[in-house]
Structure formats: structure tokens, C-alpha cells
Amino acid sequence: VRRSASATTARCLSNPGRFLAGCDGAGSRTRRQLDIGLDETDLRKLVVRELGLPRTVATLARAFRETRERPADGRFYLVHFTTPDAEILNRFGGVWHVQSPAGWTVISQNDGDTFTLHAPLGMGTDADRIDPREFVHARLGRRFEMDVLVANAWTPRLTVADSFGRGRVWLAGDAVHQVTPTGGYGMNTGVGDAVGLGWALAGVLQGWGTPGLLRAYEQERRSVALRNRRTAARHSLVRAAVMATNRAELHSERWLGARTRRRIGREISDLGNLENEALGIELGYRYDTSPAVCHESGGQAPRQTMDEYTPSTWPGARPPSVLLADGRALFDLFRRGFTLLRFADHDVTAFVGAAAERGVPLDVVDVRDTRARALYERDLVVVRPDQHVAWRGDTPPGDPLHVIDRIRGAHHGTRRSDQEKS
């Protein structure tokens, strides 16, 4: 688009391609063109169901009575700003998140001068008439110098698309899932989508991968999106429970205020800090039903919980991060294609030959490190380009072509293990 004093000129470009990746956000036109629906969890109904209608109504009524704040309608208002008076926001020491029982949160974006405030909006509030500076000052309780970078209303959503694409058009990121910011899963899930879709498209375009990789992408990433939506909803409920504890006497300097703060502090502590400590969600997700992974028929898969991460090379998992004895990170040894990690002396000539026969990029990386071998659990581990485990074993596979075909998307719908094949 070119603008001048007298005219605006637009030039449309057409770029043909074999595939289209729709990464066009929550209002994705690509998704709508494909007529793909969204499965949505209504956050307000969820809060009422989990906290109970009487408690929810009592909380809203008390907030209005004590502060004359209108009951929240589900929207939030964000103000992204910089300030030279950062010490005002760090008066109790440097923190990343400051969360108020009133429902607002201040986030330190750079451990310096940049912050974001998110605060609920009351029913009937016209967001276009809000003065961002006054909005911030009213919630933080004092005035200070600030430069507003961005300010707008937004509505938290908990949605997952019914499909992640089809044929030559596939979707990723907010186009297929939107979650509340609680836990920070939105962008992180989208990055995982980009990696998952990227290597699948590369495989198909380079000729060694089949369209089955794209179907596997949907199965793998949609399961993660559903899991992260459930977890983000759980964290939002904790926030709602904290808001339900809010009382005007929290701010009293008298003995009742101190007593109330101690009691509510215990209640908040009992709710836990899983929103910031859910390592099982952040690191421990697996593609347990993927058609592009060689699953195991025996053994016990590591237990999956929100708060615990168990390092493992169980097929479909992300392999553990290990620093080798010489100081190198094992992840830095992974290749752009598939990586066959060899922790012991095994002849993998047939395995490498099978990959070459199918045109699959497979590099052998020898690792002689006792600690790494213990964490990786097998003598041989194949890691996919997206750094998920595709196959593992203590001996080379009896039918290497079967393994190679499966991890390139040429087998669909079964969970046939290599142990069964051999």
C-alpha cells in the first residue's frame, strides 16, 4: 500500500504454493473459509459451576457494596506501558507477577521499565472512553510517570478448533486454540504447533514424508491444545477463588486488617502456585496416540501429572535435556532431520540403509556418557526433527523399513510396536 497527499494505491500479490499454513489469529479467515468450527468452554459458566452460584453472587454483591465497582462482565482491559518510576511497582522487591485479590495483574515484561496491567471490566463499561493512565493509577493506588504503548479491551476465551486443517491448508497457533493467559500456554502452544507443522510440511515437500504426517500433526497438537485448555481453565478458577476472598478490611491498618490478611494469605497459599509450577504440563506432554511414532506394547509409561515432570524417552515424549561430561548440551548434537542416538556399540547399517531407501534424513550420533544413557533409557533412540522421540530400543529393529515408514507417516491408525513386528 502506498499513500500520497492525493491518493492511496494498493497492489495485490498472488503467490502460488503447494500448501498454505493459516497462522492468522483467533479470528482466522482461513479457518472460517474451511468452515471449521470452534469448541468453546464458557469461562463464566465454569466459574459459577465450580464456585457455586451463591458464592459467586455474594462476591459480586460485596465488591459492589464495598467499592462501587460494577460486576465484571468477562472482559479485561490491558495497558502496556513503560515507566521511569519502576521502583514504585517493585516496592516489595523485584517480582514478575503482582496479582491482586481484586482480580487485576501487573506483569513485569523485561525486569526493568516495561509492564502490563490486566484488569477486569465492569458491566456496561465503554472501553473506548477509558483513560489508560487513570485506569492504571486507580488500580495501583498512586500516580506516577508512564508512557502508554498499547491499551485495549479483550475477552479471555477457552476454545479449540474442531479440526486443524485438511488437504493443502493447515492451521496453527491462535487460529486453532485460544486460552486464558493463566499459565502462559497460549504462545507456547502456538510455537509447538509451528514446529510440528513445519517439519511435517518439510517432509512432504522434500518427498520423504507422506500426507500422513499432516494428519499426525493434527492428532498430536490438538491433544496438547485440549490439555492446555483444561489446565488454563483450572488456573482461572484459582484466580476466581482468590477474588472471592477479597474484603475491604484487607486494607485496614487496624487489628482486623492484619487478621484478615493472615487468614486470606493462608487461603491463597492453600490454593497453591501451580499456575507457575506446572512442569508436567510444560515439559511432560507426550504424543501417546500419534500414528507417526513407534509405540511400545509393554512396559509402564511414566505417570503424567500437572506438577511433576519425569524425564523419559517414552515414545512420543520430548527427550530429556542433558549436559554431557564435556560440557556440551546433548540437544545441540541433534540434526535437522531424524537423529539416531547410539549410546552403545550396535551395528545400525540396516537401519541407516532403510532410511536411505525411503529418502528419510537420518544421522547417527554416537554418545558415550553414562548419565545421558541412564536418562535416555535405551541404547538406541530416534529423535524426530521436532525433538520428540519416534522410536527406541536396546537393539536395532527387526524390520527397519517398518519403523522408517511409520515415522515418515506411511502407516496410519494402528499402534503396532516394533517389538511386535520383530
Predicted regions and their residues:
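Helical substrate-recognition/capping region of FAD-dependent monooxygenase/halogenase enzymes
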Residues: L43, V48, L53, A138, ...
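Core Rossmann-like FAD-binding/catalytic domain of the broad FAD-dependent monooxygenase superfamily
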Residues: V1-R259, V365, D418
